Amino acid sequence: MGAQVRLPPGEPCREGYVLSLVCPNSSQAWCEITNVSQLLASPVLYTDLNYSINNLSISANVENKYSLYVGLVLAVSSSIFIGSSFILKKKGLLQLASKGFTRAGQGGHSYLKEWLWWVGLLSMGAGEAANFAAYAFAPATLVTPLGALSVLISAILSSYFLNEHLNIHGKIGCILSILGSTVMVIHAPQEEEVTSLHEMEMKLRDPGFISFAVIITVISLVLILIVAPKKGQTNILVYISICSLIGAFSVSSVKGLGIAIKELIEWKPVYKHPLVFVLLAVLVLSVTTQINYLNKALDTFNTSLVTPIYYVFFTSMVVTCSAILFQEWYGMTAGDIIGTLSGFFTIIIGIFLLHAFKNTDITWSELTSTAKKEAVSLNVNENNYVLLENLECSAPGYNDDVTLFSRTDD
């Protein structure tokens, strides 16, 4: 009989549960609990347990750090693929328009014969797949805000390949988005709170999350059934609020399905778990609702307003849902929480500058020339003020006049 191993906190100790063990030869073993008995007190046993606990803690920390880096790479890769896909598809559509084919906006489907458009579509598919996989390795608090990088990459590539002008506001917005993303990566949660479907099920049964889900569902139904038919065409926040509220459930479902796929790769019988099918149904329903109302928002209101507002609302709801469901913030220090929020708000400002002023044609040379003109006019006004002040000081006062006339009389 080998050394006894103590399960880490949070792992269930019950018959039939499968757990992972890291072996000394850099391999991994899967063990199934077949018998549960009471622990007998023994000094030697406690020594072995402490040794095992230390080894498990070290291996768990290494695995968590590795998973975080994998999730980060997948999230950034997703943004690159998705941001590039917009440029590739737009380039393909422009080539078709230059050849005289019917445009897609006019009901044409000739883009299906354009290879560049298909490359863009495949790039978007690869980006969505990478984003899906990122949720299985990294916290949603980190993965979701990094989606702003796709907007940044699309804006930069469009200025080079589509000859679209990127003004000074857009460049500042890109810099702020990069800085905000970097800050969020530095202060992101380092450990995953949910690593198995069993843990996911326990989190979903938490009273706090159940209350949150009920409140979100009620608000969404009120917006869909009552508010949207009356105010949807005049208030931009109605459609975007529906997309954002439902989006919290879609990201949570993606997170759970990502964990299920990871366990399936590890040859665990996840298909027997009913939670997988529940998460899949919630994902399909929430994504369908999101696409429907996001299309309504884009068709009704200006895209430059819809995009930044939707990003802020959607990301805020995802971060809130992650804090309640996965409790990713509980293990973070106050400095990391402040850093994460600061990075998020910096990204918001960058996205706002990138979209809100994209039609404003202002260059850096115009700003510098305007500043020089203001400085010159300010100097002229100061010189006039000094000249008037000197004239006033040099003019004879009333007392001087009295003294002058009195001397004359003498």
From Swiss-Prot:
Keywords: Glycoprotein, Golgi apparatus, Ion transport, Magnesium, Membrane, Transmembrane, Transmembrane helix, Transport. The keyword Transmembrane helix applies. It is a multi-pass membrane protein. SUPFAM superfamilies: Multidrug resistance efflux transporter EmrE (SSF103481). GO terms for biological process: magnesium ion transport. It comes from the Eukaryota. InterPro entries: Mg_trans_NIPA. Residues 89-114, 158-165, 229-233, 295-305, 358-410 are cytoplasmic. GO terms for molecular function: magnesium ion transmembrane transporter activity. It catalyses: Mg(2+)(in) = Mg(2+)(out). Expressed in the pancreatic islets. Residues 1-67, 136, 187-207, 255-273, 327-336 are extracellular. Pfam families: Mg_trans_NIPA. Acts as a Mg(2+) transporter. Can also transport other divalent cations such as Fe(2+), Sr(2+), Ba(2+), Mn(2+), Cu(2+) and Co(2+) but to a much less extent than Mg(2+). Belongs to the NIPA family. This is Magnesium transporter NIPA3.
